[in-house]
From Swiss-Prot:
Part of the 50S ribosomal subunit. This is Large ribosomal subunit protein uL24. PROSITE patterns: RIBOSOMAL_L24 (PS01108). The lineage of its organism: Bacteria, Pseudomonadati, Pseudomonadota, Gammaproteobacteria, Methylococcales. GO terms for molecular function: rRNA binding; structural constituent of ribosome. Pfam families: KOW, ribosomal_L24.
Length: 105
C-alpha cells in the first residue's frame, strides 16, 4: 500500500513550489507523482492536424518526487506524516500520525 495515492490532497514541502497545495493526478513508478498545479513547465508543441492538436506553448505538470510532498491534513491545516494500521476486520488503512485520524476509513 502506498503512502500517497491518486486523488489525495498534498502540500509541497521542498523545492521551487514549496507551500503549494494540489491533488495527485497520477502516481508513477519510482516514487514520482504528478500534482495538479505543481512543477509546471512550458512545452513547445508542434501542430498535428491528424490528431486535432493545435500548436503553441502549453503548460504541463511534470512529475515531482514523493519525498518532496506531504499529505495535507485539513484538521491541523498542515502537511502530516502517514502511518499504517491493521483494523479488527484485517484491513490495512492509512492514518495521520499527529491526530491518529483514519484516512481510508
Amino acid at each position: 500500500m502506498r503512502r500517497i495515492k491518486k486523488g489525495d490532497q498534498v502540500i509541497v514541502i521542498a523545492g521551487k513550489d514549496k507551500g503549494k497545495k494540489g491533488l495527485v493526478l497520477s502516481v508513477l513508478s519510482g516514487d514520482k507523482l504528478v500534482v495538479e498545479g505543481v512543477n509546471l513547465v512550458r512545452k513547445h508543441q508542434r501542430p498535428n492536424p491528424m490528431r486535432g492538436v493545435t500548436g503553441g506553448i502549453v503548460e504541463k505538470a511534470m512529475p515531482i518526487h514523493s519525498s518532496n510532498v506531504a499529505l495535507f491534513n485539513a484538521a491541523i491545516n498542515k502537511g502530516d506524516r502517514v502511518g499504517f494500521r491493521l483494523l479488527a476486520d484485517g484491513r490495512k488503512v492509512r492514518f495521520y500520525r499527529s491526530t491518529n485520524e483514519l484516512i481510508d476509513a
